[in-house]
Amino acid sequence: DTCVSDRLNRAPSVFFLKCLQPYIHYVMSQYIINAPFLLIFPVRNRLREIVGASTNWKDHQQALAERASLSQYLAQSQDELPAKTMKDSAVEAHLPLGSQPALREKYLNYHNSVRFGRILEDLDSLAVLICYSHTWNKELKRSPLSIVTALVDKIDMRKNIIYPDCDIKFTGHVTWVGKTSIEAKMHVSQYHDGAYTDVLDATFVMVARDPENKRAAFINPLKLESPEEEAIFQQGEINKTRRVELSTASLLKVAPTAEERTRIHNLFLNTLDTQTVSFRSRILPPNSVWMEDAKMKGLEICHPQERNIFNRIFGGFLMRKAYELGWANACAFVGSRPTLVAVDDIIFRKPVEIGSLLLLSSQVCYTEGMHIQVRVHTEVLDPLTRQHSTTNVFHFTFCIEKDIPAVVPQSYGESMLYLDGKRHFDETMRSQG
């Protein structure tokens, strides 16, 4: 208790985060005792029922028109809505890979492990359900809110192997609430050798919109019932402040720090040809790869099959495709199978419409020791107008048990990608201690 209370009003620290983690798991375990139990694969069907989404693509326009009438049930201020507790949103879902072998095909990869991209899809669906549980009004048959994923704050892996023949348990609840945004934390564990062991911890931030997904909508405030809950809520405030600070210091807005400029200049000097004494003649240092040669690209046609309950492309699908491309990029870069360490700072900047062409571009941005930092940029191309729009930027940290070549930028733009990758890598290492 002293560990948490002494630090509630201080700047975020690795010590605080590690100290708080057992509280989050303890609180979550207490809530799950009375939480609704469900299997993971019907979650998306449950979400369709909550919002009244169509099950057939041909009926989606009618379903959207019917949802528009729900605007009359939106609150005009947050004060109109009853406060909810963390217990109200607690959800437990199971993926019975051990007890139902027929499910394994969807989740199995070539290496006889679980496809992590599928886990990302399940996390995204569950986060939305958790938030709808928080805002649920039993007087209404359908929710007037459109709750969508705004960002993935962090996913930290707790183990390297996810077994394809052992049951997986997802638990989670709301941990922080603003006026129109809401944070949900989830914990994934797997039953192996007679006990559940930690797999990952994830933090998602969702936003509430009106039934037509055109403007923000108010959500129920959060009622805190214990010092442990106050500590968890305070961590949500810290997360929000950290995101604002990182956005303010973005290399897209401000110049690199003096230390970062020195690092880039030293990288540049290491690539100069000492025989010519010229700024134009560049040579690749030993055990290095030009950033230009550490890329991989992909294309997806956005079909209705991958739509979410609001008839845009499902965010979990985007995360899965980005992860798989980033993994392939890291694998090809080093010639060995990489292990995921963390996912962080995924921002959903713009929804992806059905029929769009989704362009994915992966880049190895930074390497250090046995770690690789990969950035995946996604954009949509409207084939009729030929306009490009960025939808997401994903950041993945991988680990490989072998020597990894350094990645070397040549242009100023590549240098900024290098520094941004280092920032994300350093943040991941700090959060994991």
Region spans (language model):
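Active-site helix/loop of acyl-thioester processing domains in fatty-acid/polyketide metabolism
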Residues: 114-142, 314-338
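Eukaryotic modular interaction domains in large regulatory/scaffold proteins
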Residues: 295-347, 351
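Single-stranded nucleic-acid-binding OB-fold domains
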Residues: 112, 116-119, 131-149, 161-163, ...
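N-terminal mitochondrial targeting presequence
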Residues: 1-46
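A cross-kingdom feature marking solvent-exposed beta-strand/loop segments within repeated
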Residues: 140-144, 149-161, 166-169, 335-351, ...
